[in-house]
Swiss-Prot record:
Family: Belongs to the short-chain dehydrogenases/reductases (SDR) family. ERG27 subfamily.
Protein name: 3-keto-steroid reductase ERG27
BP GO annotations: ergosterol biosynthetic process
One Pfam family named in its UniProt record: adh_short
This protein's record includes keyword Ubl conjugation: no
Gene Ontology MF: a single term: 3-beta-hydroxysteroid 3-dehydrogenase (NADP+) activity
Residues at the catalytic site: S179 (proton donor), Y202 (proton donor), K206 (lowers pka of active site tyr)
Record's catalysed reaction(s): 3-dehydro-4alpha-methylzymosterol + NADPH + H(+) = 4alpha-methylzymosterol + NADP(+)
Pathway terms, separated by semicolons: Steroid biosynthesis; zymosterol biosynthesis; zymosterol from lanosterol: step 5/6
Amino acid sequence: MNRKVAIVTGTNSNLGLNIVFRLIETEDTNVRLTIVVTSRTLPRVQEVINQIKDFYNKSGRVEDLEIDFDYLLVDFTNMVSVLNAYYDINKKYRAINYLFVNAAQGIFDGIDWIGAVKEVFTNPLEAVTNPTYKIQLVGVKSKDDMGLIFQANVFGPYYFISKILPQLTRGKAYIVWISSIMSDPKYLSLNDIELLKTNASYEGSKRLVDLLHLATYKDLKKLGINQYVVQPGIFTSHSFSEYLNFFTYFGMLCLFYLARLLGSPWHNIDGYKAANAPVYVTRLANPNFEKQDVKYGSATSRDGMPYIKTQEIDPTGMSDVFAYIQKKKLEWDEKLKDQIVETRTPI
């Protein structure tokens, strides 16, 4: 039986779980698939594994697909934690076949309700596609003295990839970076690559993801690794729902469906539809023919049918961003020498 290993960061999110569900549905027959669940804390690991087991038992794949589980405790805002995650992977796995970089941390501080109401009434479609009323904190640094969102969504995952490159090469892996519909170039200043001066650090981090992908996918291809960047469209997210009550959440859903009815392809609403593109590029796309310098998006038609829609990526600033991140990587290679500790606990 052929063995494959899949690491999904942010497995406990709505999108992360649905990526795993779709991977289970589409994986080849007669495969033993090890799903490496990632989390910052151990209690959440078992909860997520139980959810995946429940889906698998109902999926109709029990007879032709064997799955097992492992876990990885990693906090991408802590570079020692990132190094320990590499240490754990290096001890246990010779090859990795899938890596889904589903890092989507934001430092939200609520909603500008006056601005939200104004946007909804003046341009409802734009209000639920490219909202500007989400309040994000500015200037937040990690304990490693980096921009928190820069480290969480970009540098931490990139550093992890650089460390496990031998395993990814042996597995002829697919790397999938999860970007966003809101990764417009306007959200990133090359004078603020760590996103410390902006009030749109989340969106800026996704722009960095786009550029980092463009800067690296060709070299990875030479190693037999296929890297893609995707965006899941717009869907219900647990992380932002905490700022909504029952009525505002229901209102948001109504506006999402209205936007889809008015022709928006990006209002997937459901996390399962949002996970379409991440799994499409690993299971259905042909890397010999399909372009890797575009972004693959999860889209949905007016009548709710999911499909894939590609978007061009503006490469402006790619070289500057890559040079900055490479320099930062060398700095942390030096800082992290001999700083590995054992963190695993049996589950």
